[in-house]
């Protein structure tokens, strides 16, 4: 939404229209945040529908709109290349833990770190409810995580991890392997613990359940014997 608004502000003679399709199960907090961003902008429409992805495919096929799909469009990687360069400014950075749904962030950071010839590990963290990439990684501790997960964890409190198709899976796995990183699966209790630890040890910082995945992954890695001789970063993302 912000990118479209910036484009339209800078290109008044070539304005773009954006339709945002969201599911009926979206949290009220997320929907209200999107609505606030788009409020009063006649070029942006937010529509709630039972099947947003199918509706987007239909609109693309009929020529009504172009479906901007982060999980398959490699243009989505470009913005994260800049994030990789920012992270590279951290002296002696050794690893990055990334809450992962489609894998776009992990793929982009991994590829850019390789280009920059930086020995920074990529660690992805997924949930007990959605883990198509982590469960495919041969060295992950995911089997233990799944066996000890409570039945309630079939639905994760980290609701942004939803991509069960994982079109980027092979490239993400390649990035993890090339960086000598890892893949982790966190249950709801581990996510809540990560939120509590962060709040208590980072100047009362309150992070979302989705952001807490990164911290939960780091905690699991440390418990499983991982060690580093430099700093480790956890990506704190949006809501």
Model-based region annotation:
Residues 1-3, 28-31, 77-78, 99-109, ...:
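Short glycine/serine/threonine-rich phosphate/pyrophosphate-binding segments
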Residues 60-116, 192-201:
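Active-site/ligand-binding-proximal alpha/beta "capping" segment
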Residues 18-25, 122-126:
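Short internal beta-strands
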Residues 31-39, 46-64, 115-209:
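Active-site/ligand-binding loops adjacent to catalytic centers
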Residues 141-158, 175, 212-239:
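Phosphate-binding loop/pocket of nucleotide- and phosphate-handling active sites
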């Amino acid at each position: 939404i912000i990118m479209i608004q910036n484009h339209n502000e800078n290109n008044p003679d070539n304005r773009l229209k954006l339709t945002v399709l969201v599911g009926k199960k979206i949290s009220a907090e997320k929907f209200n945040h999107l609505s606030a961003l788009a409020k009063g902008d006649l070029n942006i429409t937010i529509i709630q529908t039972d099947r947003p992805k199918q509706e987007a495919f239909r609109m693309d096929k009929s020529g009504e709109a172009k479906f901007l799909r982060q999980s398959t469009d490699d243009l989505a990687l470009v913005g994260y290349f800049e994030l990789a360069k920012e992270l590279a400014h951290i002296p002696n950075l050794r690893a990055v833990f990334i809450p992962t749904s489609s894998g776009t962030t992990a793929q982009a950071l991994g590829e850019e770190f390789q280009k920059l010839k930086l020995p920074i590990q990529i660690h992805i963290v997924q949930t007990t409810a959605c883990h198509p990439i982590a469960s495919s990684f041969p060295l992950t501790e995911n089997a233990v995580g799944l066996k000890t997960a409570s039945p309630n964890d079939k639905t994760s409190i980290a609701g942004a991890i939803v991509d069960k198709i994982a079109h980027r899976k092979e490239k993400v796995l390649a990035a993890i392997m090339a960086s000598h990183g890892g893949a982790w699966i966190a249950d709801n209790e581990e996510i809540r613990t990560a939120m509590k630890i962060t709040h208590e040890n980072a100047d009362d910082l309150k992070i979302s359940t989705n952001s807490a995945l990164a911290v939960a992954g780091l905690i699991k890695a440390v418990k499983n014997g991982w060690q580093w001789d430099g700093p480790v970063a956890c990506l704190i993302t949006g809501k």
